[in-house]
Amino acid sequence: MTTNFHEKADTYLEATFDALEAQDEDALLEVDLEGGILTIELEDGRQWLISKHEPSGEMWLSSPISGGLHFSNTDDGWTLTDGRNLSTLTSEEISEASGAVFHL
């Protein structure tokens, strides 16, 4: 896969990590970014994993709410074929599950 994919994916993962860390004032989340995998865990043990998948050029989300989803890079960010955005979906799910508001 191209360097461009890695740059976009890494930039997305780092920005998401930074945004969650900055907004988690009540320490509701355990957020880790290692080896191209962003792990977001709530105190109750529920986890979201966001990872780059080089062979397909996609970002993959594993969620306790929506299951496994694959997002393609588009002009609107990382999106599903139905138009849902990775940042929006992740923000909504984590906000709902944690009881706090997170914006990505």
Where are these regions (language model features)?
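N-terminal intrinsically disordered, cationic/polar leader segments
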Residues: 1-49, 53-104
